[in-house]
Amino acid sequence: MGANNGKQYGSEGKGSSSISSDVSSSTDHTPTKAQKNVATSEDSDLSMRTLSTPSPALICPPNLPGFQNGRGSSTSSSSITGETVAMVHSPPPTRLTHPLIRLASRPQKEQASIDRLPDHSMVQIFSFLPTNQLCRCARVCRRWYNLAWDPRLWRTIRLTGETINVDRALKVLTRRLCQDTPNVCLMLETVTVSGCRRLTDRGLYTIAQCCPELRRLEVSGCYNISNEAVFDVVSLCPNLEHLDVSGCSKVTCISLTREASIKLSPLHGKQISIRYLDMTDCFVLEDEGLHTIAAHCTQLTHLYLRRCVRLTDEGLRYLVIYCASIKELSVSDCRFVSDFGLREIAKLESRLRYLSIAHCGRVTDVGIRYVAKYCSKLRYLNARGCEGITDHGVEYLAKNCTKLKSLDIGKCPLVSDTGLECLALNCFNLKRLSLKSCESITGQGLQIVAANCFDLQTLNVQDCEVSVEALRFVKRHCKRCVIEHTNPAFF
């Protein structure tokens, strides 16, 4: 299916010989005049180009008034209505004036000092500019226009906005960036289009075809993309390491395309180089899909499966078999994960540093004991809402994971001051502790924690029956600690 889609999209892309045939453009070629009615991005991240309004590549609604040119006339985009389109500026034209007339009209101006800088210095200066400033620089003169399109300034493309026609924007941008290196954007390493709901498989296929050096792709919340498009990207971008498909409900698996598997390309060797994978809210993902992911993505170190509600302990067994290098794992709100699943996770041993099992209602002290025994270098544990955890589970954890820095055991009603005391006497490096809605916690337990964990920075005791005196005691001993509470008498 991926191959068929590829042929369809590819044939369409070759049918156009110029950028102007794909999008309607309306530009102001007068370097000294500022364009009006162009929405500009205020993104302060200088390393990422927020292309919601990039000139060189403007993304703006066509129903805005036409851009005013130097003579006061306007040209509007009339071929496309009711959608956001990508617009690409042409270089500012060179004014042709007879030299005698120019000399007679006014004396020739001296060259500006900034124009004496070499191109590489100008590009370095441009690299520190936000997108809206780079847009203005592109309209100053022909030289600045060309420099603004230097591929080194476009290592990252970031598109934002729910209504933007992101498929067309990606097509226009990649085509322009491919002018110096036909058909490929060798410098482009990061594409972020999270929240662009109009992104479809067509847009991802454009990325797959044109960005062989892609290392990071974020398509969070783009619920129209499917497995086939993701397969195309991971098959044609062998260097991809970071993939965020959270909220993409149609994505149920990650694998190579059939063609890539048959060819056994040396770029892959049947393996995908992804190390970071976020599949939060991919609620259609099942154990078999996770099995396929684990078998192909053996280099995974960070995996987030929050609210993948169909996963069970069996899926975690597959994961541990193939992905032995996982450092961070989240299975929060996976209601079928139980102590048997934690027994499998414990096989990751000392490599595991981060674990989130929040609201996994089937987890008890038994599962916590497995993790505490084998994952001695655990630094972060989120067990909020695991109502089966008691003081015994906290004791196992405290005595074996002594370098624990962050612990969330909120909404664990069976945890009391006894568990807190054991925690305080063993985990001196604790920096973040959440006890929200722990009904059995009192001020005495908090005082023991404060007296031993001097580096505590965040303490959540909302909906806990603790006195003002206990909170003041914590504040005196942990001066940098931010206390989240619901006691109106403490401020």
Curated annotation (Swiss-Prot):
Assembly and binders: Part of the SCF (SKP1-CUL1-F-box) E3 ubiquitin-protein ligase complex SCF(FBXL7) composed of CUL1, SKP1, RBX1 and FBXL7. Interacts with AURKA; interaction takes place during mitosis but not in interphase. Interacts with BIRC5; this interaction allows BIRC5 to be polyubiquitinated by the SCF(FBXL7) E3 ubiquitin-protein ligase complex.
Assigned keywords, A-Z: Cell cycle, Cell division, Cytoplasm, Cytoskeleton, Leucine-rich repeat, Mitosis, Repeat, Ubl conjugation pathway
Protein name: F-box/LRR-repeat protein 7
Function: Substrate recognition component of a SCF (SKP1-CUL1-F-box protein) E3 ubiquitin-protein ligase complex. During mitosis, it mediates the ubiquitination and subsequent proteasomal degradation of AURKA, causing mitotic arrest. It also regulates mitochondrial function by mediating the ubiquitination and proteasomal degradation of the apoptosis inhibitor BIRC5.
Gene Ontology cellular-component annotations: centrosome; cytosol; SCF ubiquitin ligase complex; ubiquitin ligase complex
Organism superkingdom: Eukaryota
Start-end of each LRR repeat: 170-195, 196-221, 222-247, 253-281, 282-307, 308-333, 334-359, 360-385, 386-411, 412-437, 438-463
SMART domains: FBOX, LRR_CC
Annotated Low complexity bias: 10-26
